[in-house]
Amino acid sequence: QTGKDATIVELTNDNDGLGQYNFAYRTSDGIARQEQGALKNAGSENEALEVQGSYTYKGVDGKDYTVTFVANENGYQPRVQS
């Protein structure tokens, strides 16, 4: 879809308001993203948000690339797959 605006063709979103959430979307140009997060050790001195997810996009070489990740008290930890 070169030169055209992408549109969202699929979307989900849920948040319990207590530290847990998830969302996902897919666009008409093939981009996709999903993520879920949860509060770990709530109320303690070790409380931390842990997020897991992935996103996919088409590179300039025409290949699809997917990045999966975890982000928590140990930082952002991505992995790229093509």
UniProtKB/Swiss-Prot annotation:
Superkingdom is Eukaryota
Q: Name one GO molecular function term.
A: structural constituent of chitin-based larval cuticle
- Pyrrolidone carboxylic acid sites (modified residues): Q1
* Keywords of the record: Cuticle, Pyrrolidone carboxylic acid
Q: Which Pfam families match?
A: Chitin_bind_4
Instruction: Write out the transmembrane intervals.
Output: none
Q: Which residues form the Chitin-binding type R&R domain?
A: 18-82
InterPro entries xrefs: CHIT_BIND_RR_consensus, Cuticle_Struct_Prot, Insect_cuticle
Q: Does the keyword Translocase apply?
A: no
Query: Under the cellular component aspect of Gene Ontology, which terms does the record hold?
Result: chitin-based extracellular matrix
Asked if the keyword Membrane belongs to this entry, the reply reads: no
Known role: Component of the soft endocuticle of migratory locust.
Record-given protein name: Endocuticle structural glycoprotein ABD-5
Q: Which organism is it from?
A: Locusta migratoria
